[in-house]
Structure formats: C-alpha cells, structure tokens
Swiss-Prot record:
Pathway(s) the chain acts in: Amino-acid biosynthesis; L-leucine biosynthesis; L-leucine from 3-methyl-2-oxobutanoate: step 3/4
Entry's localization field: Cytoplasm
Residues binding Mg(2+), per UniProt: D218, D242, D246
InterPro entries: ICDH/IPMDH (IPR050501), IsoPropMal-DH-like_dom (IPR024084), LeuB_actb (IPR023698)
Binding annotation for NAD(+): G278, S279, A280, P281, D282, I283, A284, G285, Q286, N287, K288, A289, N290
Main location: cytoplasm
Function of the protein: Catalyzes the oxidation of 3-carboxy-2-hydroxy-4-methylpentanoate (3-isopropylmalate) to 3-carboxy-4-methyl-2-oxopentanoate. The product decarboxylates to 4-methyl-2 oxopentanoate.
Quaternary structure and interacting proteins, as annotated: Homodimer.
Organism of this sequence: Bifidobacterium longum subsp. infantis (strain ATCC 15697 / DSM 20088 / JCM 1222 / NCTC 11817 / S12)
Protein name: 3-isopropylmalate dehydrogenase
Cofactors, names only: Mg(2+); Mn(2+)
Length: 343
C-alpha cells in the first residue's frame, strides 16, 4: 500500500489560486501507485489579511508544521504595502521551519526564447543559504529622521549554518554534473568570505568526484549572461543568492517556467515549494496564467520526498509540452490538461 503524505496547500493570492490546483493534479498523477496525498488548505494571504488582519496565526502555523511538505501558490496584493505579507508569512515560515536552503533550478527548455543571443545549454541550479546573512534581521537605526541618523544591517554567518548548506550543495552536485561554484565577495567581505571558502574546501575533500571553483559575485553576474552553460551548482549566501536567482530566471526566458523550494533538509519541518512568479493581480481570475511553474514545483516536492521517477514524469511532460506548444496561446486549464495528458 502506498504511503500517504500530508501536504499543506497555501494558494495565496491572485493567480496562485488558479495554478496551485494543477500542481496538486500533477502530484497525484505522477505519483499514482507509489504515493498518496492528503491536503490541508490554508486561507493565508492578502484576502485574509484585509478581512481580519491575520497573516500567520500561531495555531495555523502549528498545523502547517505537522505536514510533510507545503505547496504555495503566490502571495502579494497592490492594496497591501510591500513587505508586510512577505515578512509576516513567507519569511516567518522560512525561519520558523528552518528552511535553510533556497533551491532554484534554471533550465532553458526547447521552445523557449532566451534574451541571450547565444545562450547555449543552460541547466544549472542555485543553492542559496536561506536563514542567515543580511536577511536575518540583525541591525538597527538610531537618531531616525535626523541628519545624524545611523542605520546598520549586520550579516550573520555561522559555521554551522554555512556547513549544512555547503553539504547540501555537494550532495546535490553528485546527482548532476558534479561541479560546485562558490559565489561570494571574499576579497572585500574577508571574514564571512574566508569562512565560506574554508568550509567549501573542507567539505569538498569528502567529495573527490565533485570539482569546485570560486567566483566573485560581480564576475558571476557577468558569466550568467555571457557563458551560463559553465555552471552546474551555484552555491552562495542569502543576499547574493537573491540577486543571482532573479538573473537566472531571466536568462532562461522569464519566471513562467521556474519553480523554487525552501528546503529543510533535515526533515524536522516541512519544506515549501512554489512557482517563482508573483500573484499577477492584473490577470487573476481570467484563466490566463501559465501553470507550468506551479507544476514544476510539484516535481521538486516529489524529488524532495524521494520520488525521483515520479518527478521525472512531470519534467518529461513539461519539456515535451513546451517544445511543441510553448509558443501557443492557451488558457490556464488547457496548459494543465495538455501537460497531464503527456504523463
């Protein structure tokens, strides 16, 4: 009998509510016979916040933690000041669930036009540290709104936090082309950069099959547009990863075909998977949104649970659909049906 996995579903806002059901359908079809899924839906996002002021109530977060994984649609609404939902929902889940790896695959599919003149074979993944660095909230300000105001943001890097994400990157590289590129700015950020490099060198000794090199962040941004095929696994910190993942999404044709995962690799808490596109309120409710990225997030969820063959069914179906019909204008439902029909 197939094991049943509990999945927390947060459709969120805008087109998130339209594309998430297709991720669920892809999960079920790809894993048919090997895994079953039990869903718990959570009404979290802009509408909930505007209705009763709640972002992530404690009891609901507790129920989310009891699941095996999380499927997220999209969060954001122009009626709400930027940052409120992102900090109160997405970042809170990331930190409370210790999702210390932000995983962002970037692949240029046949049938998708890259903005690069000669993109080559683009297929790499960014492994971004997700709970430390400049985004952990250390810092402050004094003498606000005066000429003497002082503001600080402190980048926190711990050996423990760095080593666990480095190990994740090398383990992932073993399943791919066996190459890791550390991206940092160690010539200027000498303390954090030196620690990152030493830990990469140490862990690298345990993976003799995996080669590794280093690039400064400025050089890496250049190579992402001049020679992206050189990369396999890009390993970097929170801030640099935030920059690189956006650029990576652009070189493969935009956010419509990109998914991401916020991973707790210890499985102490559930990991979260989502398309990287936003809530797109301008087309919400019109059956226009492309569900491909959401469906790819379902493949990432399956890979995380250990169902690589099931995930491959989704990847194969998506690649075939994009190659044949990627330039065809289709509705949300039609794209979803076309992809599922190939599985």
């Amino acid at each position: 009998m197939a094991k049943t996995y509990k999945i927390a579903v947060i459709p969120g806002d805008g087109i998130g509510k339209e594309v998430t059901p297709w991720a669920q359908k892809a999960l079920e079809k790809a894993a048919e016979g090997v895994a079953d899924f039990e869903y718990e839906n959570f009404d979290l996002g802009a509408e909930r916040y505007l209705r009763d002021g709640a972002i992530l109530p404690e009891d609901e977060e507790g129920r989310i933690k009891a699941n095996d994984a999380i499927l997220l649609g999209a969060v954001g609404d122009p009626r709400i000041k930027a940052g409120i939902l992102e900090r109160g929902l997405l970042l809170k889940l990331r930190f409370d669930l210790d999702q210390y790896v932000n995983l962002r695959p970037s692949k240029l599919y046949k049938g998708v036009t890259s903005p690069l003149a000669n993109p080559g074979d683009i297929d790499f993944v960014v492994v971004r540290e997700g709970t430390e660095g400049l985004y952990c909230g250390a810092g402050g300000a004094v003498r606000r709104n005066t000429p003497q105001e002082v503001a600080t943001e402190v980048s926190i890097n711990t050996a423990y936090g760095v080593e666990r994400v480095v190990r994740y990157a090398f383990k992932l590289a073993m399943k791919r082309k066996k190459h890791v590129t550390l991206v940092h700015k160690k010539n200027v950020l000498v303390n954090a950069g030196d620690m990152w490099q030493r830990i990469v060198d140490k862990v690298g000794e345990e993976y003799p099959e995996v080669t590794h090199d280093y690039q400064h962040i400025d050089a890496a941004t250049i190579f992402l547009v001049s020679d992206p095929s050189r990369f396999d696994v890009i390993l970097t910190d929170n801030l640099f990863g935030d920059i690189l993942t956006d650029e990576a999404g652009s070189v493969v044709g935009g956010v419509g075909y990109s998914a991401s995962g916020c991973i707790n690799a210890s499985d102490e808490f559930p990991s979260m998977f989502e398309p990287i596109h936003g809530s797109a309120p301008d087309i919400a409710g019109q059956n226009k949104a492309n569900p491909t990225a959401a469906i790819l997030s379902a493949a990432m969820l399956l890979e995380h649970l250990g169902f690589d063959d099931a995930a491959k069914k989704i990847h194969t179906a998506v690649e075939a659909d994009i190659e044949e019909l990627g330039s065809t204008v289709r509705s949300t439902d039609q794209v979803g049906k076309d992809i599922l029909a190939r599985m």
